Amino acid sequence: MRKKILFFAMTLLLLTGITASADVLGEQNGGWSTYMGAFTYFHNVQFNSDSVGKQNEYYVEYTPNEDAVPIVVNGASIWGTRNIKQAEQYMQENGLRPLAGINADYFSFKTGIPMGYTIADGEIISKEYGGQDAVGFRSDGTGFIKWLDIQTTVTDGEKSIDVMYINKWCQAGFDPVYLLTDKFGKTTKTQSECIFVICTPNEGRLHVDETMSLTVDDVFIYNGEIEIPEGKVVLLMDTSGVSEYYDFLSRLH
């Protein structure tokens, strides 16, 4: 009989404020604006100062509306470096017309994995450990900045352990438990001996403030990367990690 376990994600949000920065660009002496459609404008403002000379400021002005909505795009997988032109092509191939784009997060130049949180339509695409300031958008297109801290656990019976990272790179010598989905990529990219727990989602979703029920399909140890089956969830950790976590995963047969 395959074992069933529960995965729970809880979010902690705190409102934070933004203070206006000092005017250090100098005296404004020119600029232009271009209407891009869907209540969106592209602005250029030119400044000049005695200390640094001529400077240009570029920004997009967006009025929330139903024709243009902010989205997060990282291509077909979390793993992999891509430039903004590749992101634009990915959107066009999926029936979307981009108006403007910016880097949404710091990311690894080696892996392309964002260093913070990525959430789309409530689904946890990628999760970091600990809290961070986050930029979000409501369904009506309006934006906000809040402190975001998602705490995730996996439970088997009366015992639970923390899952610190979701769709992040599990590297050799790191202690915590990771959770990977097929959104991470085709393989786990692991380069050391790890314990892997392959699970099938039953009920619930990998969403903020929700519980997801999983059925354990297989538990094994392997040195290197493995394929991530489509639709499956993989729990894993380096075998040299925290013994309490290792014992928990190994008992999920």
PLM regions and their residue ranges:
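Sec-dependent N-terminal signal peptides of Gram-positive bacterial secreted proteins and lipoproteins
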Residues: K4-A22
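Gly/Ser/Thr/Pro-rich low-complexity, intrinsically disordered segments
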Residues: S21-H253
